[in-house]
């Protein structure tokens, strides 16, 4: 059903087309005017006109019919289920009454930062081992004595008691804990073995560290924290080298910043890289090629505890692509 909303009667002579009249009268486009006519909204002398080019003459009466607005049915509401965030799985290597040794997966923080991230290795372990909440010297790092970068993976020890925490903390301070990594770097490293001794300090970019250059006499040009990294070549590829890396100090991002200073940045590193070396292989790898393969420390009895870890499948499968 329609209701007339407006009528126009031509008293003056006119020879305009119907569509042109509407464009001038209502300041609309020719297309809009033609659409009104074609949708049977216009009556000329009480007869529906669908001809856009209908010629108007003196005495013609135009009625613009306003059709009732029929609202389309509201779309059905469906409960949208958001898939839960996939958290990398933690592999537990061993559990004792004093400590837990795990393999931290790539992509997971060791502990939350000042941003209070909800997902971390520490948070996951606390759910399974609630006693960890009382261990350590920082509530954000329950039981955590050392850490692995979020992008890295591999072995990590977590203290279950305060006594073990203090015992491990002292070993790290005395630098008696053994940590070795499997690391793939850009470029063909010439030496089968070498040491990197550049001191490390925080860069102007707060997210980065920097290896400080040394003078000809071997002293750092700027004061920084002493750092020592030792490596052995495991395998050479055309443009890459697989290394076994041992760190004798535990500076933040030590392996990554030292390898960058050695002109051999770690493959897949989103933070420490050289533009000329970053290529498609970093994307193909899909992650930082740095995995802690060896960890050794002494327990409360003074016995040496040693653990080894194999490269994860994604890194094992990546290496043959480089041959």
Model segments located where?
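RNA pseudouridine synthases
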Residues: 2-323
């Amino acid at each position: 059903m329609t209701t007339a909303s407006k009528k126009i009667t031509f008293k003056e002579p006119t020879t305009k087309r119907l569509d042109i009249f509407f464009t001038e009268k209502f300041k609309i486009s020719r297309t809009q005017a033609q659409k009104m006519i074609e949708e049977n909204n216009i009556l000329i002398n009480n007869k529906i006109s669908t001809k856009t080019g209908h010629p108007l003459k003196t005495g013609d009466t135009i009625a613009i019919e306003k059709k009732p607005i029929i609202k389309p049915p509201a779309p059905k509401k469906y409960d949208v289920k958001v898939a839960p965030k996939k958290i990398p799985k933690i592999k537990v290597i061993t559990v004792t009454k004093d400590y837990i040794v795990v393999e931290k997966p790539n992509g997971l923080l060791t502990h939350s930062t000042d941003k209070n991230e909800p997902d971390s290795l520490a948070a996951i372990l606390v759910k399974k081992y609630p006693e960890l909440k009382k261990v350590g010297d920082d509530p954000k790092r329950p039981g955590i004595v050392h850490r692995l970068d979020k992008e890295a993976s591999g072995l990590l020890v977590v203290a279950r008691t305060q006594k073990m925490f203090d015992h491990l903390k002292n070993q790290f301070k005395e630098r008696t804990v053994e940590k070795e990594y499997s690391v793939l770097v850009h470029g063909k490293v010439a030496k089968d073995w070498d040491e990197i001794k550049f001191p490390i300090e925080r860069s102007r970019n707060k997210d980065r560290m920097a290896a400080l250059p040394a003078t000809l006499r071997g002293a750092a040009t700027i004061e920084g924290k002493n750092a020592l990294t030792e490596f052995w070549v495991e395998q050479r590829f055309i443009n890459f080298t697989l290394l076994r890396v041992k760190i004798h100090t535990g500076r933040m991002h030590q392996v990554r910043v030292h390898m960058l200073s050695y002109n051999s940045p770690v493959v897949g590193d989103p933070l420490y890289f050289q533009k000329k070396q970053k290529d498609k292989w970093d994307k193909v790898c899909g992650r930082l090629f740095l995995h802690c393969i060896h960890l050794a420390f002494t327990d409360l009895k003074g016995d040496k505890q040693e653990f080894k870890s194999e490269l994860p499948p994604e890194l094992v499968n990546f290496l043959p692509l480089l041959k």
